[in-house]
A protein has these predicted regions:
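A non-transmembrane, solvent-exposed segment enriched in polar/low-complexity residues
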Residues: 13-139
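Short active-site neighborhood of thiol/selenol oxidoreductases, capturing the structured segment around
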Residues: 216-246, 256-260
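Thiol/disulfide oxidoreductase modules built on the thioredoxin-like
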Residues: 278, 287-324
Length: 324
């Protein structure tokens, strides 16, 4: 009998470890409404509803709260939908308590019985630290096999060109065919190549920013002077770009600086683009085109960060690095 009780306890413990429970509170304003539980891909772009499937579960809000439980699902992100709101969480093992804070009507992962809760970890990255660069990157690498890692990759992380292949190889095969961001990333990895020091530049054609003639990169790179291809994709880090170009001009007085960027609509960014053209003699390219037609695609820039490739006078890569 003692052995049997221990055996049952072991089964119960294992079962509990492999299930998630989410306790969603603070919903008093929606008392009596129905909350539906939906399953989404890691990037939250598509879910079961898009394929005509029913929700996983539903519950009525009683005393300002609902409770959902199920088997841990590391390959998906779940969403709880009630009138006018869809709130997401990662269905990891353990009991997660979410508190709906109004305003602005967002669920706060208050606590979890999982001491290694990635829901709580993500919340701290997001709302306490505003996604610090290295901690966010580490979150993605730690969760490369999980849906929550690719959700962060798709929206907030700076993963650099020479890291993408390795990161992709860590993903479960089940996610690769059903997650939009992974499908797009695989398409890029198959169509492009990763550069390393000593490699020749990759040619591309792009329109100059002021709607001038198209520019062929091979007309500049490998023509007897150093060339910096500097992707300006994070406008709140302008000072880092200024400093980098100044340093490059001190080291390579005849360097050509080519800056692919977006056509930002705000006056501050427009002013900075003008500054790059006039004060820093940079050639600005409009890289707002569809991703697969962009210079970003050719150079494996997947995300929003500033990054440079430095080529020597013969067009060989000297170094590649983020501009921080």
């Amino acid at each position: 009998w003692i052995f049997y009780s221990l055996f049952l306890g072991l089964i119960s413990c294992q079962s509990q470890e492999q299930t998630f429970t989410v306790h969603y509170t603070g919903l008093g304003a929606y008392e009596g409404d129905t909350v539906y539980l939906w399953r989404y891909g890691a990037d939250r772009m598509t879910g079961d509803r898009d394929y005509g499937k029913a929700p996983l579960d539903f519950a009525i809000i009683r005393n300002g709260e609902v409770l959902f439980s199920g088997k841990e699902d590391t390959l998906h992100i779940y969403g709880m939908e009630h009138p006018g709101s869809m709130n997401f969480f990662y269905p990891e093992r353990g009991k997660l308590t979410l508190i709906n804070v109004v305003p602005p009507a967002i669920p706060v992962p208050d606590k979890s019985t999982n001491l290694h809760s990635q829901n709580v970890r993500l919340w701290k990255l997001w709302h306490e630290d505003d996604f610090p660069l290295e901690a966010t990157r580490q979150f993605v690498f730690d969760n490369a096999r999980n849906a929550i890692g690719w959700m962060v990759f798709d929206r907030w992380a700076a993963i650099y060109p020479d890291e993408l292949e390795t990161l992709y190889q860590k993903t479960p095969s089940q996610m690769r065919d059903s997650t939009s961001v992974l499908i797009g990333l695989k398409r890029m990895l198959d169509a492009t190549r990763s550069l390393k020091p000593g490699d020749h530049f990759i040619d591309f054609k792009q329109v100059e920013y002021a709607e001038k003639d198209s520019l062929l990169f091979s007309d500049i790179a490998g023509q007897g002077h150093s060339v910096c291809l500097l992707f300006f994709l994070k406008p709140n880090e302008k000072d880092a770009v200024r400093t980098e170009i100044k340093n490059l001009r001190e080291q390579y007085p005849d360097i050509r600086v080519i800056v692919p960027t977006y056509r930002y609509p705000d006056p501050e960014s427009k002013e900075f683009i003008h500054e790059l053209e006039t004060d820093y003699q940079a050639t600005i390219l409009d890289d707002s085109r569809r991703f697969e037609k962009s210079a970003r695609w050719e150079y494996r820039i997947y995300g929003f960060f500033n990054y440079e490739y430095l080529f020597d006078a013969q067009g060989q890569l000297v170094k590649m690095k983020p501009v921080l």
